[in-house]
Amino acid sequence: MDEEPERTKRWEGGYERTWEILKEDETGSLKATIEDILFKAKRKRVFEHHGQVRLGMMRHLYVVVDGSRTMEDQDLKPNRLTCTLKLLEYFVEEYFDQNPISQIGIIVTKSKRAEKLTELSGNPRKHITSLKKAVDMTCHGEPSLYNSLSMAMQTLKHMPGHTSREVLIIFSSLTTCDPSNIYDLIKTLKTAKIRVSVIGLSAEVRVCTVLARETGGTYHVILDETHYKELLAHHVSPPPASSSSECSLIRMGFPQHTIASLSDQDAKPSFSMAHLDNNSTEPGLTLGGYFCPQCRAKYCELPVECKICGLTLVSAPHLARSYHHLFPLDAFQEISLEEYKGERFCYGCQGELKDQHVYVCTVCQNVFCVDCDVFVHDSLHCCPGCIHKIPTPSGI
């Protein structure tokens, strides 16, 4: 009988004496412990890069932003809404830098409703402009996960099978006001192969846990603004494609940008096909632009899917910038600073190595600090030491 309570509560073992994880420094601060948690999260993301795994390179992502009254809380400065919109501006820039042939859209949910801030588009300027304007938005009412997901699904379910369909929810509230059973909607999302991930700003919510688990997404709750930015950065890289997703050759067009001057007698001003959208912010009649090589329809920006013939229009640099996702840089080997016998300076920033651990490239054997290690894997995608060893052609 005495052993029974112990067996029934065995699952609670991971939550016993959690205060022992926290350690104070000389001044009584817990900052060092929190920084250690964030540091381990950075390293984990480097190791989680999917080498030689088929990825969803062409992505369609809807970001759902909670616009309820809880976004006025000031635990993030100056408040949750302003902090979120600023971080999303950074996220949009990074997203299109790493995924130039992908598209993104933004949905805001408040007062039990959902409305589109921007449609799915490959134009980062359009999204950033809308995010800047949304700073003046009033936050009130409760969010509706059901209405937000339904709105995103209505667009995503029509996307081609070879593209990834994703939803990222920034959820501040602890409640959701839905018109119907959200668990039925989760089953529909799973059938439509839409991956839903959630970043919580308050605490873990049961329905979000089920939503992320059933659709193959992730669910995290932020610690602070720095951790918030890290969690958003986690969604910049393309996710692994599911084994059931279609695999097919994609026909693409590579239009050249045509520039015509007013002195050219043959030049005729024309509208961009983007003007088919009533809310388009593109300029009016223009002389130049990108002309579809198949049907000669005109567009002001790339990448885009031709509204006339359906051809995907991109530029060669767009594909080149997507290439590194297929062959990611291997993780550097972590070594204790005491065990490392080489120079005590980082090869990347030339700073003195002071951390407990250093990181060595397994190919060129050069050593890096943790910040350069994360920068090389998240932004540079190639080892500076390995590139330096490549001989320069004699003709240059």
From Swiss-Prot:
User: A single GO CC term, please?
Assistant: core TFIIH complex portion of holo TFIIH complex
Cellular compartments annotated: Nucleus
Give the keywords, sorted: DNA damage, DNA repair, Metal-binding, Nucleus, Phosphoprotein, Transcription, Transcription regulation, Zinc, Zinc-finger
Could you say which residue ranges form the zinc fingers (C4-type)? Answer: 292-309
- Keyword Transport attributed: no
All copies of the VWFA domain together span 60-236
The GO terms this record gives for MF are:
zinc ion binding
Q: Which domain of life is it from?
A: Eukaryota
Asked whether the keyword Zinc is assigned, the reply is yes
Gene3D superfamilies under this entry?
Answer: von Willebrand factor, type A domain, Zinc/RING finger domain, C3HC4 (zinc finger)
One BP annotation, GO:
nucleotide-excision repair
The PTM Phosphotyrosine maps to: Y95
Q: Which SMART domains match?
A: C1_4 (SM01047), VWA (SM00327)
| Pfam families found in the cross-reference section | C1_4 (PF07975), Ssl1 (PF04056)
Q: Which NCBIfam families match?
A: ssl1 (TIGR00622)
User: What family does the entry list?
Assistant: Belongs to the GTF2H2 family.
Summarize the protein's role: Component of the general transcription and DNA repair factor IIH (TFIIH) core complex, which is involved in general and transcription-coupled nucleotide excision repair (NER) of damaged DNA and, when complexed to CAK, in RNA transcription by RNA polymerase II. In NER, TFIIH acts by opening DNA around the lesion to allow the excision of the damaged oligonucleotide and its replacement by a new DNA fragment. In transcription, TFIIH has an essential role in transcription initiation.
Describe the protein's quaternary organization and the partners it interacts with.
Answer: Component of the TFIID-containing RNA polymerase II pre-initiation complex that is composed of TBP and at least GTF2A1, GTF2A2, GTF2E1, GTF2E2, GTF2F1, GTF2H2, GTF2H3, GTF2H4, GTF2H5, GTF2B, TCEA1, ERCC2 and ERCC3. Component of the 7-subunit TFIIH core complex composed of XPB/ERCC3, XPD/ERCC2, GTF2H1, GTF2H2, GTF2H3, GTF2H4 and GTF2H5, which is active in NER. The core complex associates with the 3-subunit CDK-activating kinase (CAK) module composed of CCNH/cyclin H, CDK7 and MNAT1 to form the 10-subunit holoenzyme (holo-TFIIH) active in transcription.
- Please identify the protein, giving its name as recorded: General transcription factor IIH subunit 2
Protein's organism:
Mus musculus (Mouse)
